[in-house]
């Protein structure tokens, strides 16, 4: 049979299939339980000739980035990063708004954008050591200067307002808590002291509006302390058997993924607290952990233990559902990703190995 005859015989079938597809999915929209394919938009990164880019924060069209190089220790036993450049980049205009060569050498590993062309960054001072213990928070603007230095660990640094950032920390003297950082300096937003009943954890920190939430251990239990703008503290103690995987602070209260043992049965719970009530979803104990929880306006993201990106959505019953994301390129499945909340209901997903950046707007 000739090729033209075959094509002619297939045309009616192809026409029917095309009409069915258009009828089932107008405008390319997917079912309400799925994520529209157009919510992920790849963004440009600043061009570099040496090293690689690491995105630390995102606010609107601005990203805070560093250019870093991976180096080996003198004995070749371990690798470390050295920051060569700090910059603020507008992904829409595709141009740099500010670029600095760090006056203080080190590994700038966390950061927060401020209003204008300024930022606050977390710095490992003894970055060539296998286990750094000298840290600083640095201001970058019209000048570069140290806001605070400590021996211990600067753990998480997050934007708090257009003029401030928050950083969780612990010192070798036993003090721990949260610093409030601005161009004017450093103050204590939450100050605790380690003793027989109180101890720091991993420095997990979350921000929502003018409130923040910090995790530590008290009397052997994981405790989440939410601090309001007026300094009021609201402590939430998890069950004695609970182990914290991750959490985030929402307008209604904390969203928590935790491992618990109840009635000799191990399980994981994704719990949303709202108006004093707990809305729980049970997850598999073995592989149900969620990390890097980020949530805003009823949607968010997290990663599982295999770096699989998970979409979070608020359900009508008040619980938060979770499913794997399949809309991104296959090579980005189960690889390291940094989830950034942009503060406007959108999120940025930075893949350091692939050097790719996406904006995600789940409600679009």
Describe the function of each predicted region.
Residues 334-364:
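Blade-level signature of beta-propeller repeat domains, shared across WD40, Kelch, NHL, RCC1
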Residues 65-73, 78-80, 121-129, 167-173, ...:
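Beta-strand C-termini and the immediately following turn/loop, strongest in propeller blades
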Residues 1-11:
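Bacterial N-terminal signal peptides that target proteins for export
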Residues 46-84:
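Beta-strand-rich domains and repeat architectures in extracellular enzymes and scaffolds
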Residues 23-25:
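Bacterial signal peptide processing site
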Residues 18-21:
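C-terminal motif of bacterial Sec signal peptides marking the signal peptidase cleavage site
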Residues 32-46, 76-101, 128-150, 176-194, ...:
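Surface-exposed loop/turn elements that mediate protein-protein interactions on large endomembrane-trafficking
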Residues 50-60, 105-116, 152-162, 197-208, ...:
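Repeated scaffold domains used in trafficking and secretory/extracellular systems
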